[in-house]
């Protein structure tokens, strides 16, 4: 009798490897503004602006991971999503603490357009996490976890600057996500959906960092 368990093709990169490769090209680490914040001595207003924007997008509950868990479009992803949701609850609290510490949003031209853009990002994330296509939300969450390593570097820099003690990183480590996605992305259809979800998440992050870069330029802080 044929097995009902999808076999894993070990001759090609795993689904997590695909997510990581996409992130190397389109993720936060590839964006000049994110790397500028990490590698230089950024203006305090630029750090504050980044914290406020990230809290606006990811500081709300339920968030993208919670929505994906509730939807459960790919049942096999639920244990991994539960772990990710638990870890991200800590990140959400950290964002709230940082937002209070950095003070008011820096005065920047075009604030109304910024608010509309951030609302657009939140809406896009809701669509991804609520997708009924098995693997789409999985890919989006995987990309978020991969990209959050760099995002967390920015947050930790802000924490140091503003006198906040950063909590331990509690999101699933790369090897755990890689193992989960090896099974979740074993079929061609699921793999395509994971890739699509990751691509869309990175596109939203790229737009977010570009928005922050444009705001820094408008303030004369670049």
Q: Language-model features: where?
A:
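Active-site-proximal alpha-helical scaffolds that flank and shape metal-associated catalytic sites
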Residues: 76-173
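Terminal targeting/low-complexity segments that flank the catalytic cores of oxidoreductases
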Residues: 1-75, 146-222
């Amino acid at each position: 009798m044929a097995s009902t368990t999808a076999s894993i093709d070990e001759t090609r990169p795993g689904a997590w490897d695909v997510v990581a490769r996409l992130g190397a090209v389109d993720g936060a680490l590839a964006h000049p503004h994110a790397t500028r914040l990490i590698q230089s001595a950024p203006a305090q207003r630029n750090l504050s602006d980044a914290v406020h924007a990230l809290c606006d997008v990811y500081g709300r509950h339920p968030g993208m991971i919670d929505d994906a868990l509730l939807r459960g479009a790919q049942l096999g992803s639920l244990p991994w999503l539960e772990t990710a949701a638990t870890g991200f609850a800590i990140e959400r609290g950290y964002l709230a603490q940082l937002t209070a510490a950095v003070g008011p949003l820096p005065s920047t031209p075009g604030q109304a357009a910024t608010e509309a853009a951030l609302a657009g990002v939140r809406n896009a994330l809701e669509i991804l996490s609520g997708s009924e296509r098995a693997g789409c939300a999985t890919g989006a969450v995987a990309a978020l976890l991969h990209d959050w390593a760099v995002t967390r570097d920015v947050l930790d820099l802000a924490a140091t600057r503003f006198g906040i003690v950063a909590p331990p990183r509690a999101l699933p480590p790369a090897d755990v996500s890689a193992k989960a996605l090896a099974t979740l992305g074993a079929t061609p259809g699921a793999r395509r959906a994971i890739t699509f979800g990751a691509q869309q998440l990175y596109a939203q992050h790229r737009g977010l960092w570009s928005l922050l870069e444009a705001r820094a330029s408008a303030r004369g802080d670049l």
